[in-house]
Each structure stands twice: as C-alpha cells, then as structure tokens.
Swiss-Prot record:
Domain of life per record: Bacteria
Lineage start: Bacteria, Bacillati, Mycoplasmatota, Mycoplasmoidales, Mycoplasmoidaceae
Keywords of this entry: Ribonucleoprotein, Ribosomal protein
Annotated PANTHER family: 50S RIBOSOMAL PROTEIN L36, CHLOROPLASTIC, LARGE RIBOSOMAL SUBUNIT PROTEIN BL36C
SUPFAM superfamilies tied to this protein: Ribosomal protein L36
A GO MF term: structural constituent of ribosome
Entry's Gene Ontology BP terms: translation
Family: Belongs to the bacterial ribosomal protein bL36 family.
Full protein name: Large ribosomal subunit protein bL36
Gene Ontology terms: cellular component: cytoplasm; ribonucleoprotein complex; ribosome
Pfam families assigned to the protein according to its UniProt record, in alphabetical order: Ribosomal_L36
Length: 37
C-alpha cells in the first residue's frame, strides 16, 4: 500500500474507489495498491 498525494491508475486493471473520503486504487497487481488522505 502506497500513500500518495495524488493517486493514478497505473494499468488497465486499476480501479479508483472512494471509501469514507479516502480515494483508493484497487488492482490485482499488489504493487499498484494506493490510497490518498
């Protein structure tokens, strides 16, 4: 899990999901997991 100021989808499997005012990137590639805030 990377915590970043700006989250971007890295590959075509990355999905941006908003949960409780936190932006997350969920992907089947474990390296691409990110969250913001």
């Amino acid at each position: 899990m990377k915590v970043r100021a700006s989250v971007k989808p890295i590959c075509k499997d990355c999905k941006i999901i908003k949960r409780h005012r936190i932006l997350r990137v969920i992907c089947k590639t474990k390296k691409h997991k990110q969250r913001q805030g």
